[in-house]
Every structure is written in structure tokens, then in C-alpha cells.
Amino acid sequence: MPTLLQHAQIDWDDQGRPHSRHYDDVYFAVNEGIEETKHVFLGQTRLAERFANLAPHACTVIGETGFGTGMNFFCAWQLFDQHAHSDARLHFVSVEKYPLDHADMARAVRLWPELAAYTEPLLEQYVAVHPGFQQFTFTGGRVTLTLLIGDVLEQLPQLDAQIDVWFLDGFAPAKNPDMWTPELFAQLARLSHPGTVLGTFTTTGWVRRSLVEAGFAMKKVPGIGKKWEVMSGAYVGPLPGPCAPWYARPAVTQGPREALVIGAGLAGSSSAASLARRGWQVTVLERHEAPAQEASGNPQGVLYLKLSAHGTALSQMILSGFGYTRRQLQRLQRGRDWDACGVLQLAFDSKEAERQGKLAAAFDPGLLHCLARAEAEAIAGVALPGGGLFYPEGGWVHPPALCQQQLQHPGIHLVTHQEVLELRKVDEQWQAWAGDQLLARAPVVVLAGAADVLRFEPCAQLPLKRIRGQITRLPATVSSQALRTVVCAEGYVAPPREGEHTLGASFDFHSEDLAPTVAEHQGNLALLDEISVDLAQRLAVAELDPEQLQGRAAFRCTSPDYLPIVGPIADAQAFAEAYAVLGRDARQVPDVPCPWLGGLYVNSGHGSRGLITAPLSGELVAAWVCGEPLPLPRAVAQACHPNRFGLRRLIRGK
């Protein structure tokens, strides 16, 4: 999957319209753009009627080729507001190869002041838009936008969704022949179902014939303005073939929209918020006296992207998760709860410098770029041993603030001092027990207690491990406040928050004791010396008594492949029996439904990346539960799936 972002190259004509240099065409007609959208895409698909008929909590999914300036999205959102039930939802999925940068997007959408109620919320969240899947939430989750940034023929095959309405847009076939291909139409068919409708402005004969061959019944209809005719259609072809059963969608839970989430850290609060935004009543059971008391409780966590130049599943998830988290943080108070101060990763040896050079060549400079020592020092505000890789959109977060913000939804009920020891399934309801006390029950449960999920029998075989980490809190001084960005080497140090710098973090694979130790404080101070001797002097580290230093320790929870474990849970024994043939031939795909433990999900194993991966994983869990488009590429969702470990055991004969 390509990693390099290519923004749209825009010129502006004398009427103020954006013009694409790449396609040598305007994005929309000067006086008729909105009316064309309403006629071709909203009218021909009878979208107002569809919205009006939506039941409470039902969701219409619109798919689009070519997001461009977002006009079709804004018009669809406006129509949804006008006609849909207040509890209905809209999920808009759009592919864009060359996204507009923020300045161009702002200039374009302000041509439509009548749509400001819809364009301004997008502009507020239009940050960290990088290649791959980028999800946005609006109006408390009632409207979701998933942008697929990249080539349509690379992105759509990775989409796991059922589309109800297609907006077949993008520049005209003559201007954009690489998009209008049989491969595209085959993907439209794969993602459609009987009843899916389609609107498009083009009436080109070969496009119509190709859509018919793909399974759409197409017809020409009167156009508008200079477009004499346009086309509309409906999918009448067969359903797509099933995927591998171990990654198939579980049946959507019917009945009351009630869920339990066990654990109120980042993974738990994110899962609860994502479900609550979809109309679920969520009870969160937390064993401590408040949320974010374990690994999510550090005063400052770093928004740091440890990427690969090769587009691995982990790298793709980090890019998508980083964008999603950054957009969620816009709702918090900057300076107190988080800060986009940037993150500088020092090139502390030749191997690291080589790695950074490869990353800088693979990614957009807006995401990361190399700095020489003088440039790095100018940004950091302190003397450094060398240059490094700078992430201008990164920064630090106070994780408890993010957890608390997510738990404030009126559909969430947090119950503290409740330690769940056992789960039982009785009459399609999961019951949470503590000894002989029934704590709560619901048809859906999300286990989000880091490595503590292993105490529950359905998760006992998940290969999670705990790694102890300790941070040190250093009182800021007048001169240490010069530090303006997070700086990392083997450890990290953040600019001050409420009068303290956070310094960390140790890695201990053996200790089970959470009491902070003097030895690890000393180890963290040694990490600070590697980052900046100047900053250590500004903090008067030599005068500090390690015995008096404050800090906290917690357990990171990680998996062997460093990807989180997110998704539905299957019965381990029945799974091994159903797919035992894989031990003899890994190419087999038995026609046996996966033995899901209906309504049971997990969100764990985020390691030291929880700020980046846990919030989007909450959306992934909710998409599984509700049968919505997944917010990550299929291959990435499968790489995070709990069943991956059962498959590996079968194939390896263990």
C-alpha cells in the first residue's frame, strides 16, 4: 500500500472555482454545482425518501468515488438532517486519490455559505489526513465520514462494507480513464446488495455497458443544466462470495441495544463511546475508584508514530489511528489535556539515522521530515546531541482526560469498584459475576481490561503479555520551560504540563510489582542525559535525590506481533475442531461457519501505542457489533483479529 500522500494541485479560475491541474478540469460547475449534485446523486437515488424511511438506529451507507471538495457529502448530510429520524445514522465512505490540503479545502467550501453548518465541522477536524482509511465523526456520532485516501483500485478492494447508495463521481472518464475501469465496477458490485442504487453524471456508452456487466440495471434519465442526460441504476446481480469463515462477520445482535464494557482505560472508554454514539446503552464496569487508573493513567503520553516504510499492517493502523485520535483531541482543552507540540525522534546512532532517512523518503513531509541538528534545536528550544525525524502533528496527551471525555456520553453508565471475575452466557445474555454477586448483564460484552482479559475463559488462549513501565515526574524550572516539543531517543521527555515534565519510560519484562523504584528513576534520568544534557542541566538533575522523585508504574499489554487484538471472540475448542484440516493443508477454506461466542468482543493488546490505536479500535469493535463499514482496511482488521492466533496454532500444528 503506497505511503506517500499526494495533495491535489489546485488552480483557481476567475470565478473562484478550484481547477485540478492533474485532471485539467474543474471540480464543479460555477452556478450549478449544488443543483447538479442534488439532481444526479440525491434525486436519482431517491435519497430523501430513503432517509425518511430509516428506522431509529438504522444506518444508511453511501459510497462515493472522488471526494474532491466534499460537495456531495455536505449535500447528503444536509438532506439527512432534513428527513431522517433523530436516532438514525449516516455513514459516508468516499475514496480520494488527491485530497485537498486544508487551505484549499477551506477556500473551496466557503463558496457555499448555505452549507456552512456542514462544511465548518469538517474543517475543524480536517487534520492528519494521510494515506489509507481516515475516519471522522460528526454530530455526536450521528454522521460518520470514512475517507479512503489513495487510488480507488487499491482502496476499494480493502473496504469491508455493504453500500446502500453509490455516488459514482470523480472527473469524467475522458479526463480520468485510470479510474473508470471494469475493475472499479467489479468492486462496486462486490460491495453492493440487492436494493443498492447508483447515480452518476456520465452517460458514456462503455461505462453503462460495463456497469450492466457488473450486475447493475442502468437507465438514462433527464439531466440538468448543461448535462442533458445522466444515469441511474440499481444492483440486480448476485451477492458476493463469502470470505474465509474465520474472518466473516458475526450475526448482528438483535434485541435491546445494551452492552457491557469491562475496563475503563483507553480501550474500554473508546469502545463504550463508539457504541453509545450508535444508540447503545453501555454499562462500564471498572474495578478501581475511577477510570484510567492503570496504563492509561500517566500524566502525559506521547502521540508518536513508529512507522514502517513498507506499508505494513501495523503501519497502516498507526496512520489511521493517529488521524482518528488527533481529530478526537480537537474536543479537549489544548495545553491542559493535550498539545500538538510535535515529536522529535533523535537519530541517536547510524542505524536509526538510516531508518529515518527511509521513512522521510516514504512519507509526506507534513507527516514527518528530517531535521539537521540546528533545525532540531530551534524547534525543541534546548541543545541536542544531533538532528532527527520531526512529526509536526504529534505531541502529548493527558490520557485520563481523553478517557473521561469519552465516558461523558449520556448513554454510558460508569460503575466503579466492580471487579468482574467470571462471565456466563444465559439465555442470549452475558452475565458479569463477582463470586456469587451478579454485577450486570447484556447481550453484548467488550473485554477491554488489557492482560486481565486472560482471566475470562474465552480469552485464555490469547498470547498477551505484560511489560512493566515506569515514568518519572520532574518539576519544571524556569529554564526547562524552554522545551517546546516532545523529544525521544531510547526514552522520551515532554514539555511541562501543570508544572511537571514527564520522563520515561522503563521496560521491565519480569517484575510484577507496581511500586515505583529508585533504580528505574535513575534509569530514566540516564535516558534524559541521552536526549539532552542541556535539558538535564536546566532541570538540575544532578541536584535531585532519586529517593524523593515521584512517578508511577503500570503494565503495558502487548501481543507477539505488536498488533492489538480487536474483534469478535470464537469458541476456541469448536474453532480448532471446525478448521482442523488447516493443520494438513493451510490452503483449505472449509465451508463451516465460525463458532462465534455471540456478542463477545475484545479490545486489548495496545502496548505503548494505546493513544493511537485504542480509540480507532473502539470504532472497529462498534462496526463489528453493528454490521457497519470497518474503519480499517480488511487486511489490517484481519491482522488485528483474535482468530489470527487460533489459525496460526492450527497451521503450525501446535
From Swiss-Prot:
Renumbered residue ranges of the record's region FAD-dependent cmnm(5)s(2)U34 oxidoreductase: 262-654
Cofactors (names): FAD
Signal peptide as annotated in the record: none
Function of the molecule: Catalyzes the last two steps in the biosynthesis of 5-methylaminomethyl-2-thiouridine (mnm(5)s(2)U) at the wobble position (U34) in tRNA. Catalyzes the FAD-dependent demodification of cmnm(5)s(2)U34 to nm(5)s(2)U34, followed by the transfer of a methyl group from S-adenosyl-L-methionine to nm(5)s(2)U34, to form mnm(5)s(2)U34.
GO biological process terms on file: methylation; tRNA wobble uridine modification
Record flagged with keyword Transferase: yes
Gene3D superfamilies: D-Amino Acid Oxidase, subunit A, domain 2, FAD/NAD(P)-binding domain, Vaccinia Virus protein VP39
One of the record's GO cellular component terms: cytoplasm
Entry's localization field: Cytoplasm
Family listed: In the N-terminal section; belongs to the methyltransferase superfamily. tRNA (mnm(5)s(2)U34)-methyltransferase family. In the C-terminal section; belongs to the DAO family.
InterPro entries: FAD-dep_OxRdtase, FAD/NAD-bd_sf, MnmC-like_methylTransf, SAM-dependent_MTases_sf, tRNA_MAMT_biosynth_bifunc_MnmC, tRNA_MNMC2, tRNA_S-uridine_synth_MnmC_C
Species name: Pseudomonas putida (strain ATCC 47054 / DSM 6125 / CFBP 8728 / NCIMB 11950 / KT2440)
EC number(s) reported in the record: 2.1.1.61, 1.5.-.-
Keywords noted in UniProt: Cytoplasm, FAD, Flavoprotein, Methyltransferase, Multifunctional enzyme, Oxidoreductase, S-adenosyl-L-methionine, Transferase, tRNA processing
Region spans: tRNA (mnm(5)s(2)U34)-methyltransferase: 1-236
Gene Ontology molecular function, alphabetical: flavin adenine dinucleotide binding; oxidoreductase activity, acting on the CH-NH group of donors; tRNA (5-methylaminomethyl-2-thiouridylate)(34)-methyltransferase activity
Identification of the protein by name: tRNA 5-methylaminomethyl-2-thiouridine biosynthesis bifunctional protein MnmC
Reactions it catalyzes: 5-aminomethyl-2-thiouridine(34) in tRNA + S-adenosyl-L-methionine = 5-methylaminomethyl-2-thiouridine(34) in tRNA + S-adenosyl-L-homocysteine + H(+)
